[in-house]
A protein has these predicted regions:
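N-terminal beta-strand motif that seeds the catalytic metal site of vicinal oxygen chelate
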Residues: 1-19, 68-71, 126-134
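A generic structural micro-feature
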Residues: 2, 63-65, 108-109
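Core segments of cupin and vicinal oxygen chelate
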Residues: 2-3, 9-52, 80, 87
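A generic structural signal for ordered alpha-helices
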Residues: 6, 23, 56-59, 63, ...
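Vicinal oxygen chelate
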Residues: 7, 34, 73, 83-134
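Acidic di-acidic motifs
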Residues: 14, 77, 119
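Conserved short beta-strand elements that form part of the metal-binding/catalytic scaffold
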Residues: 29-68, 118, 124-129
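Ampipathic, surface-exposed secondary-structure segments
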Residues: 55-92
Length: 134
């Protein structure tokens, strides 16, 4: 039996601002934007090429906004991905790698090249470059 992670809840304070950030600046696909009753709204977005989506919502969960850290997006070319984010107005860190427990500015080896950014609500994201696939 397969167990698949399909949806991650991302706690936010402002649905419209978060939808614009993820849809227009980060480049996620907006799959769904629906109002469920008077107090509940759900927006589903999916990163290009991903099988896992995220929900931005109000009135569904009791998760404080801005508490998620380490949400990880794996990309084939971190320089291109980071440049796309910066071009769209996202503040992204320099490209870094971990060396003996310390972050160092420059590329690392396989699976050890990263950049970081946060959404407007303070949730932290990690870009990680995967090795080239044959």
């Amino acid at each position: 039996m397969d167990w698949r992670l399909e949806v991650v809840q991302v706690p936010i304070t402002d649905v419209d601002r978060a939808k614009r950030f993820y849809g227009e600046q980060v480049g996620f696909n907006v799959d769904l934007d629906t109002q469920i009753g008077d107090k509940m709204r759900l927006v589903q977005l999916t990163p290009p090429g991903s099988a896992c989506s995220m929900h931005l919502s109000t009135g569904i969960h009791n998760i404080p906004p801005g508490v998620l850290e380490g949400l990880q997006l794996v990309v084939p070319d971190i320089e291109v991905a980071r440049a796309q984010l910066v071009e769209r107005g996202v503040e992204a860190s320099s490209i870094q790698h971990m060396d003996d427990g310390v972050w160092v500015e420059r590329r690392g080896g396989d699976w050890n090249t990263f950049a970081f950014f946060s959404d407007p609500g303070g949730n932290g994201w990690v870009l990680q470059e995967r090795p080239a696939r044959d």
